[in-house]
């Protein structure tokens, strides 16, 4: 029997760069993984069948497609993906209050129509790939990333969403405002020995949890490790020891 860790519900394994066969092998190597993130690349390549396969492996699924469109389109898209029986879906908070409210309502209605549990709906704030310089230059913004994250998190909360996606840098600020029933999901997680790759606002797993993150999205630190399960267990231990 595998040893259980208190923090197993806090780690979401990102499998976006893998095909289905590779993902299944990785999950066999890492039996303590409860949560899996399916992103745009994997979902476009494999389609809804990847959700069926992961559900067959008894995994909880964060379908991270980051919908961002007019309210009607977002409402229809959220209704459809909610019928797949996933556990969390993501939408861009910058789509606006009406789009967020409509998406949340549609996810409930879509899931209920096929008798599956409605997913949590979380709002994307500012992508972790942005540095402050790039954010202000590329998007022609004069204010800080933190100010924008704060505004978009409030929009998500006011729309009745279940949480938001932010970098671990902003998690402490948001957790001081929003209580534990508001999910703070943080990508941008790296171990001390890792390259930062295309992420900028990053932290280690234990630092992110200490800052108030409720779930951590971790991909390459586990999937590209020489021993993925060993890397995963070290992450669990680092969080559980806090």
From Swiss-Prot:
PROSITE patterns: OMPDECASE. InterPro entries: Aldolase_TIM, OMPdecase, OMPdecase_AS, OMPdecase_bac, OMPdeCOase_dom, RibuloseP-bd_barrel. Pathway: Pyrimidine metabolism; UMP biosynthesis via de novo pathway; UMP from orotate: step 2/2. Its EC number is 4.1.1.23. It is an enzyme of class 4 (lyase). Keywords: Decarboxylase, Lyase, Pyrimidine biosynthesis. GO terms for molecular function: orotidine-5'-phosphate decarboxylase activity. The active site is at 66 (proton donor). SMART domains: OMPdecase. Belongs to the OMP decarboxylase family. Type 1 subfamily. Catalyzes the decarboxylation of orotidine 5'-monophosphate (OMP) to uridine 5'-monophosphate (UMP). This is Orotidine 5'-phosphate decarboxylase.
């Amino acid at each position: 029997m595998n040893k259980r860790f208190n923090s197993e519900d806090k780690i979401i394994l990102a499998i976006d760069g893998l095909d289905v066969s590779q993902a299944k092998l990785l999950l066999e190597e890492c039996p303590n993984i409860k949560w899996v993130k399916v992103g745009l690349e994997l979902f476009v390549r494999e389609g809804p069948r990847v959700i069926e396969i992961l559900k067959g492996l008894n995994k909880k699924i964060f379908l991270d497609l980051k919908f961002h469109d007019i309210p009607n389109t977002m409402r229809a898209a959220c209704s459809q993906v909610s019928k797949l029986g996933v556990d969390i879906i993501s939408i861009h908070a910058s789509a606006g209050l009406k789009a967020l409210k409509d998406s949340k309502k549609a996810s409930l209605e879509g899931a209920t129509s096929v008798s599956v549990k409605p997913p949590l709906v979380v709002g994307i704030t500012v992508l972790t790939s942005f540095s402050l310089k790039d954010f202000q230059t590329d998007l022609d913004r004069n204010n800080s990333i933190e100010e924008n994250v704060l505004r978009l998190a409030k929009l998500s909360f006011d729309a009745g969403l279940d949480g938001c996606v932010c970098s671990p840098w902003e998690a402490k600020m948001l957790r001081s405002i929003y209580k534990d029933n508001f999910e703070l999901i943080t990508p941008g997680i790296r171990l001390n020995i890792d390259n930062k790759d295309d992420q900028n606002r990053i932290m280690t797993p234990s630092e992110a949890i200490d800052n108030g993150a409720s779930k951590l999205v971790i991909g390459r630190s586990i999937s590209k490790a020489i021993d993925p399960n060993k890397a995963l267990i070290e992450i669990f231990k680092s969080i559980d020891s806090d």
